[in-house]
Amino acid sequence: MSNPSAPPPYEDHNPLYPGSPPPGGYGQPSVLPGGYPAYPAYPQPGYGHPAGYPQPVPPVHPMPMNYGHDYNEEERAGSDSFRPGEWDDRKVRHSFIQKVYCIISVQLLITVAIIAIFTFVEPVGKYVRNNVAVYYVSYAVFLVTYLTLACCQGPRRRFPWDIILLTIFTLALGFVTGTISSMYENKAVIIAMIITAVVSISVTIFCFQTKVDFTSCTGLFCVLGIVLMVTGIVTSIVLIFKYIYWLHMVYAALGAICFTLFLAYDTQLVLGNRKHTISPEDYITGALQIYTDIVYIFTFVLQLVGSRD
């Protein structure tokens, strides 16, 4: 278009929509026409964002969650987004753990008090040693309440029967343990208490930290329980006729090891995030199992380190 008065050529019939770009493409204008504010050109591949404008906010990715090793990829993909229910479940589990260990603390305080009275108060210790009926009646009450709480869902979930049965169970097992402790020297009882406390705390810390899932080995623990029960029956029959020291010590060591493993298993059932867990409604069951494990560890350790009066 060299002559302004001449009509535009055929190629310029629509000057707003040019037909074909010139060879080499269009270059970006260095300066926009006067009168209009400068506006940054669109970013080209390989070029950064124009200076003076904030960069766009990057997409927000969900925070990675800490999954257990049992989660598969499909479950992980379906759980990547934040769900408010996860925090609720976590709060429920934490509240459940606190409730279980508060109950266990009260049970252990009652048991330690009974053991101290039976051991350090000589008239009481002498009375329970001379009256074995106290031991057998307490043991019968212990078995009945234990089986009721462990096997019957109704009583252990119904207030106030759960508290009443658990209190009777704790007192009965405390009387049994106190009677056994009264037959040993005071020093042996104190040493057994210290060892039991160290073992119980160590197992609990280990269960909080480890990735080993003891709850996936239910069959193994059933076998251990059967072996311990059969060994106890055979040992009791043999010791009735003749006391064999090494046989007694082997049985006590086996019992201490087995109930330490049972404590780890039951602790992981309470902590959750494993293959098998206890329902938050069964806090009585959790306290019952862990408390029983600790008491049995104490009795077996007492047999190992103690000497009878």
UniProtKB/Swiss-Prot annotation:
Disruption phenotype: Mice (older than 14 months) are prone to aortic dilation as well as cystic medial degeneration (CMD).
GO biological process, one term: negative regulation of Fas signaling pathway
Membrane topology: Multi-pass membrane protein
CDD domains noted in UniProt: LFG_like
Keywords (A to Z) from UniProt: Endosome, Lysosome, Membrane, Phosphoprotein, Transmembrane, Transmembrane helix
Superkingdom of the organism of origin: Eukaryota
InterPro entries membership: Bax_inhibitor_1-related (IPR006214)
Molecular functions per Gene Ontology: death receptor binding
Residues where Phosphoserine is found: 79, 81
Gene Ontology CC entries for this record: endosome membrane; Golgi apparatus; lysosomal membrane
Transmembrane residue ranges: 101-121, 132-152, 163-183, 188-208, 221-241, 244-264, 286-306
Location within or outside the cell: Membrane; Lysosome membrane; Endosome membrane
Function: Negatively regulates aortic matrix metalloproteinase-9 (MMP9) production and may play a protective role in vascular remodeling.
Family: Belongs to the BI1 family. LFG subfamily.
Protein name: Protein lifeguard 3
Natural source organism: Mus musculus (Mouse)
Gene that encodes the chain: Tmbim1
